[in-house]
């Protein structure tokens, strides 16, 4: 469960390394966001040679959470970290690679480009 002021790891090669959530858009509830929800973030740590700089305000989609997600078959999926992928306004990723595994629930939420770039889909 991600809320405002949560710090998240960035799972792509856009140049940002760590972000802070400042708002939740279209979340399942008003206060918490889960896998597949879009959040507004500000960049806290970035690499110096990247296109994204510290302080930039961007949109991102949550791809991994420690809290986990209950699937329709009754199983749960949990990850070791909370992670996001930086996206553009047309919901395509800004980076060209996505690191780590992501949940297949993103396919149901129409993030097919992120699914195709991911190393592993669980």
Curated annotation (Swiss-Prot):
Name under which the protein is recorded: Large ribosomal subunit protein uL14
SUPFAM superfamilies per UniProt: Ribosomal protein L14
Any one GO molecular-function label of the UniProt entry: large ribosomal subunit rRNA binding
GO cellular component: cytosolic large ribosomal subunit
NCBIfam families: rplN_bact
Function description: Binds to 23S rRNA. Forms part of two intersubunit bridges in the 70S ribosome.
Protein species of origin: Phytoplasma mali (strain AT)
Protein's GO biological process: translation
Alphabetical list of PROSITE patterns matching this protein: RIBOSOMAL_L14
InterPro entries xrefs: Ribosomal_uL14 (IPR000218), Ribosomal_uL14_bac-type (IPR005745), Ribosomal_uL14_CS (IPR019972), Ribosomal_uL14_sf (IPR036853)
A Pfam family it matches: Ribosomal_L14
Top-rank taxon: Bacteria
Family: Belongs to the universal ribosomal protein uL14 family.
Subunit structure: Part of the 50S ribosomal subunit. Forms a cluster with proteins L3 and L19. In the 70S ribosome, L14 and L19 interact and together make contacts with the 16S rRNA in bridges B5 and B8.
Annotated signal sequence range: none
Keywords: Ribonucleoprotein, Ribosomal protein, RNA-binding, rRNA-binding
Gene: rplN
